[in-house]
Design a protein with these regions (language model features):
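Bacterial Sec-dependent N-terminal signal peptides
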Residues: 1-16
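Serine-esterase "nucleophile elbow" of acetyl-processing enzymes
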Residues: 14, 92-94, 134-138, 142-216, ...
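Glycan-recognition and processing domains
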Residues: 15-62
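Extended, charged alpha/beta regions that create polyanion-binding interfaces
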Residues: 58-170, 375-377
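Structural recognition of the beta-strand scaffold that forms the well-ordered cores
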Residues: 177-180, 209-213, 236-240, 271-276, ...
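Oxyanion-hole/transition-state-stabilizing segment in secreted/luminal serine hydrolases
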Residues: 194, 202, 219-258, 263-266, ...
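Catalytic cores of extracellular degradative/oxidative enzymes
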Residues: 206, 210-317, 327, 332, ...
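Catalytic His-Asp segment of secreted/periplasmic serine-dependent ester chemistry enzymes
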Residues: 278-365, 509-578
């Protein structure tokens, strides 16, 4: 009887399909660096570093700390299976931190959620994520971020989904990374799971690539390691090596820190953040430990002051007092718990936001966030990547930021929906406009895109902003106006010489009065802040104040080509001088 039944079980086992990131047609290992050399591996330094960096650093570079895999899937169940190169755990750090993985989902409104997986640590480690729900907007699932082990190497890894589900890997981010060079603490000791390492908490908060070059016991500001760091074009370099330098002479530590900054500055002008030793859990009860902390941080401070006195610009500093790791923030004498990791990440994030001019507001319209509300029409992240490539290869002299009204108007990147192609070609293209519109964007989504490079690396003569209608019904008028004010500040920071024009919210069916009222408030704010306001949408109204349905595609929101003809001239016209 068992012989008869056995084949009946085989199809169930075969109903899974497995995806190997190494077999993707493009690099998919995020937060890695040196992608052209090691993008088909789970390591952190290229092969040519072997014999150049110290043997311990080389061995530790084979650990996958900070690496991640991003993908889309609509699967109701996801499995991850893989093998590792070393021991599963350490006395002070569990298997879930040393050798585990972490999975987060991101829904269509950009909200992150931790996914708990049932795990099994055997020769092949497995994580199983069950009963996955559906997105509120569509049936194409979620974006996922899979974070890899902190203190182990990955031999091979596969992601499994039911055979009737879909999985699509996301290419490596083209954005400039933050590069973190540090010690065991930076590598992730002693987080309970990979995403709780402070560098990864920072990465998740900022949503920039962050390359983790933490090397346990070997974060010593070595010029050989800095040589490879200098090959990476980063938006910020963080040096957090003081915890591995307490046993060196004070003057030597000062010299090392100064030399490290100068070595990086020879190749790059990006900001550099120096971080002091965060302290020991027992430093107030152990006089030797207290003296170690005092000495190494005094040396670090001397280095920073010397750097400042020499006029080396864009070097920043965080002290032990700034970090303020609480007494319950350690697992042992020096390695933070999740509590300590979170504290350090919060403090560093606050400083990084100041350095990179990426503030957070208190309203939802002032907190940058991604979206994926209509993947059946386009992939938002893919369009963002296309924008970055477009402005890099063809620096525009004018840009228009907006939502679907802009997105489906015309221009590049190409899209099958073009509601006003003729008008775009007649008016906007001759005026030099690059279309930076994304369907279903809200104010906070445009803020994310600005923080992530769409206005960087070129000088535009004009910036036109046409956003806010999708915040209707979700935010009150004050939140919308303040969100626009916040957004305009971000635009001015990145395009200080451009003239900036804000287009009033276009009229929409059954909400014409609300549009009139809020445009009055928007106009007042815009002109007070010194920008130009235009309200071409009045041309889309009948004499009774209702929209002219013949000028829209049928939804009472998106203009057709005739509608665009009536508003394009005022949108594209030259702005007043700022």
């Amino acid at each position: 009887m068992f012989i008869v039944l056995l084949p009946a079980f085989l199809p169930a086992a075969a109903q899974w399909k497995w995806h190997n990131p190494m077999e993707a047609s493009f690099p998919v290992i995020q937060n890695q660096g040196f992608t052209k050399e090691i993008g088909n591996s789970y390591t952190r330094l290229p092969e040519r570093a072997k014999g150049v960096v110290s043997e311990p650093v080389w061995n530790l570079s084979q650990h996958s700390a900070g690496l991640a895999i991003h993908f889309y899937s609509n699967a109701p169940q996801i499995k991850v299976r893989y093998t590792v190169t070393g021991s599963l755990n350490m006395p002070h750090m569990p298997s879930t931190g040393v050798s585990g993985v972490d999975l987060y989902s991101i829904n269509s409104d950009g909200e992150w959620h931790f996914c708990f997986g049932n795990y099994s640590f055997k020769d092949t480690i497995t994580y199983t994520y069950n009963n996955i729900g559906k997105d509120r907007y569509h049936k194409q699932g979620f974006e996922y971020r899979l974070y890899l082990p902190l203190y182990n190497g990955v031999k091979w890894l596969e992601i499994g989904i039911p055979e009737d589900a879909k999985l699509e890997f996301i290419p490596v981010s083209p954005e400039k990374p933050i590069v973190l060079y540090g010690t065991s603490i930076a590598q992730g000791a002693c987080a309970s799971r990979p995403a709780m390492a402070w560098g990864t908490i920072l990465q998740r908060s900022l949503d920039y690539p962050l390359i983790n070059l933490g090397f346990s016991g070997n974060g010593k500001l070595a010029k050989e390691v800095l040589q490879f760091i200098g090959e990476m074009d980063a938006r910020l370099y963080i040096l957090d090596c003081m915890p591995n330098l307490p046993n060196q002479k004070e003057e030597d530590v000062t010299a090392l820190a100064i030399a490290a900054v100068k070595q990086l500055r020879e190749k790059h002008s990006a900001p550099i953040l120096l971080i002091e030793h965060g302290g020991y859990s027992n430093m107030y009860m152990d006089s030797i430990k207290y003296n170690e902390i005092t000495q190494v941080n005094r040396a670090s401070r001397k280095a920073y002051e010397q750097i400042q006195s020499e006029g080396i610009k864009d070097v920043y500093y965080l002290s032990r007092e700034d970090l303020n790791i609480p007494s319950d923030g350690w697992v042992d004498y020096v390695h933070p718990s999740d509590f300590g990791m979170k504290q350090q990440a919060i403090v560093v994030e606050r400083k990084v936001r100041e350095i990179l001019h990426i503030p957070l507001g208190s309203l939802t319209t002032t907190i940058p966030v991604t979206q994926r509300r209509e993947p059946h029409m386009y992939e938002w992240q893919a369009r963002h990547r296309a924008f970055l490539e477009q402005v890099r290869n063809h620096p525009p002299k004018a840009v228009i930021l907006g939502n679907s009204i802009t997105h489906y108007w015309g221009g590049e990147p190409e899209h099958r929906n073009k509601n006003g192609r003729e008008t775009w070609e007649k008016v906007m293209r001759p005026a030099g406009f690059q279309n930076l519109g994304c369907g279903w964007d809200r104010i906070e989504n445009v803020l994310w895109r600005i923080y992530h490079g769409e206005l960087d690396g070129y000088k535009a003569g004009k910036v036109v902003l046409m956003i806010g209608t999708n915040n209707c019904g979700l935010n009150n008028d004050k939140e919308i106006v303040e969100g626009l004010r916040f957004l305009l500040s971000a635009i001015r920071q990145r395009q200080p010489e451009a003239s900036v024009k804000v287009i009033g919210i276009l009229p929409r069916r059954n909400q014409e009065q609300w549009v009139r009222n809020i445009n009055f408030d928007i106009k007042e704010m815009v002109e007070t802040e010194g920008y130009e306001f235009a309200n071409p949408g009045t041309a889309l109204l009948l004499q009774d104040g209702k929209i002219d349905e013949s000028l829209f595609i049928g939804d009472g929101l998106h203009p057709n080509n005739r509608g665009y003809e009536l508003i394009a001239g005022e949108i594209a016209s030259s702005n007043k001088s700022y």
